[in-house]
């Protein structure tokens, strides 16, 4: 019996959702992530989500916080045009965890946060038995310091994403001209 409990203790922490601790402060006020943001980096274990000409890239404009959800206001490139869109992530019973039903069920985790400078979100989705992980880095300014980018890359590595699957979005058209 003790061996079984030990085995379970070694297996359970390896589940992807067990990797999510949220912001360092358990009393962090989610309202602090509201406001204007810029997409700075994107990473995924699935290369199609970060490909150069994919329609799957979303560029953040702002985040609104309600008692029940986070509302992400994005621009998305569709055939070269910047199209505004909104996605609502509904709060769950677990702190800093949200769900989205957009192209399938996704679980989004609010991870590392410095509300005056950056925020990292990590999304997990399961389709046909395969898990996809997408990690985004948003900044209050169009770019981030090398230290923040290093921390983002380190975070991605701990979630099984190779550095070749991390894209610096500051070198792409992020639909900045379409922001209001």
From Swiss-Prot:
Taxonomy of origin reads: Eukaryota, Metazoa, Chordata, Craniata, Vertebrata
Q: Which GO terms describe its cellular component?
A: extracellular space
Q: Which residues form the signal peptide?
A: 1-18
* Keywords, in A-Z order: Disulfide bond, Glycoprotein, Secreted, Signal, Transport
Q: Which Cys residues form disulphide pairs?
A: 82-175
For this UniProt entry, the molecular function terms from Gene Ontology, in alphabetical order, are:
small molecule binding
Compartments where found? Secreted
Predominant place of localization: secreted
Provide the protein name: Uterocalin
